[in-house]
From Swiss-Prot:
Family designation: Belongs to the ubiquitin-conjugating enzyme family. FTS subfamily.
SMART domains: UBCc (SM00212)
Domain of life (superkingdom): Eukaryota
Upper classification of the organism: Eukaryota, Metazoa, Ecdysozoa, Arthropoda, Hexapoda
Protein name: Protein crossbronx homolog
Length: 228
């Protein structure tokens, strides 16, 4: 293996470590109602779901993805948050679901900027829209912004529609299957009943599934980082 190849391998290993560290950090932050997991196939694509607990979008269950730049985190390019669910919001582009983050994250600063901060912002704009002043230059859904400013009743009606739509689509399967895609099943007493009962009794549940092979994106039998 040449020196150049060794350098590239080391760079890939360090990048994988940084991505895993970024994901691990989510566990220590207060992100109640937000669930995120990296794609099995692509470490630069993360799947997320937010259960909105308060505010105008309360009871909404919105799916989203986070796309990391190829050189993340050593890149000033900000990761892209795109809602897969329809979200009627002044800062969410109605054509592709991309959330405009330029107000809070004009550029990515390695060591200072973190994914958990982005998720906190997603949570904030859905639960505290009244407390967030949106600069007009950061509006990407003019209809939503105009209704919010001039016809609140109509705005709330549109929001209610997207909340109900998100609930109807909760159990939909992904267009492109991924082993780590966050899926939900309807309540099955035979399957979920014992788990629910143990939670009520505060007892640990016996795990019958095999242990995870970890979050490393190295294909079995290979030693190349990020090879999945």
């Amino acid at each position: 293996m040449t020196l150049d190849a060794n350098d590239k391998l080391l760079e890939a290993v360090l990048q994988e470590y940084k991505i895993l560290a970024e994901y691990e950090r989510l566990q220590s932050e207060d992100l109640g109602g937000i669930y995120v997991t990296p794609s099995y196939e692509n470490p630069f694509l993360w799947f997320g779901v937010i259960f909105v607990r308060s505010g105008m979008y309360k009871d909404g269950v919105f799916r989203f993805t986070i796309s990391l730049p190829n050189r993340f985190p050593n890149d000033s390019t900000v990761p892209v948050v795109a809602f897969q669910s329809d979200v009627f919001h002044p800062m969410v582009n109605p054509s592709d679901g991309v959330l405009n983050l330029s107000d809070t994250f004009p550029k990515w600063q390695s060591g200072d900027s973190h994914i958990w901060q982005m998720l906190k912002f997603v949570q904030f704009i859905l639960q505290n829209l009244d407390d967030h002043t949106i600069p007009s230059e950061h509006v990407v859904n003019n209809e939503a912004y105009q209704l919010l400013m001039e016809n609140r009743a109509e705005f709330l009606l549109r929001v209610e529609q997207c909340v109900e739509d998100s609930q109807r689509k909760l159990y939909d399967l992904p267009a492109q299957p991924d082993r780590f895609y966050i899926c939900f099943d309807r309540f099955n007493p035979d399957v979920h009943g014992p788990v629910l009962q143990s939670m009520k009794e505060d007892k640990p549940t016996e795990v019958t599934t095999p242990p995870s092979s970890g979050l490393s994106w190295v294909r079995k039998g290979f030693y190349q980082p990020l090879s999945k």
